[in-house]
């Protein structure tokens, strides 16, 4: 089995507290980062773990509760400010996340230097 690292950025709370952050994890596999959920404050925790934003190209949102996706628009904006050019893929149940985020991206991240590709994962 191939070695991978799992970074627990937040778990155990829908609300940020002094001891717990809302859910977000990063899997480090084959020199690539895969994020599972992106809660409020996630990008600060990524920096604290010294993970490179440039290695993150895939984000998976488990379900559409705010504590699992409120950090996305800030992270997308930060990527643009850092000069990102590679595509970012975001996977989520159904098409609702793109419907919610696309207007925010168009408004807050107008002229972004990279493409965000949404993938709707069908409900079972």
Predicted segments, located by residue:
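Binuclear metal-dependent hydrolase catalytic cores
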Residues: 1-124
């Amino acid at each position: 089995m191939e070695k991978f690292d799992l970074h627990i950025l937040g778990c155990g709370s829908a609300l940020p507290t002094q001891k717990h952050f809302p859910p977000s994890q990063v899997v480090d596999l084959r020199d690539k980062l895969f994020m599972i959920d992106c809660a409020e404050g996630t990008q600060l925790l990524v920096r604290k773990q010294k993970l490179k934003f440039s290695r993150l190209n895939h984000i998976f949102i488990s379900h559409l509760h705010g504590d699992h996706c409120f950090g996305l628009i800030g992270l997308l904006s930060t990527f643009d400010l850092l000069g990102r050019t590679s595509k970012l893929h975001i996977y989520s149940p159904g098409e609702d996340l793109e419907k919610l985020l696309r207007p925010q991206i168009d408004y807050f991240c107008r002229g972004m230097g990279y493409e965000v590709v949404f993938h709707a994962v069908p409900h079972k």
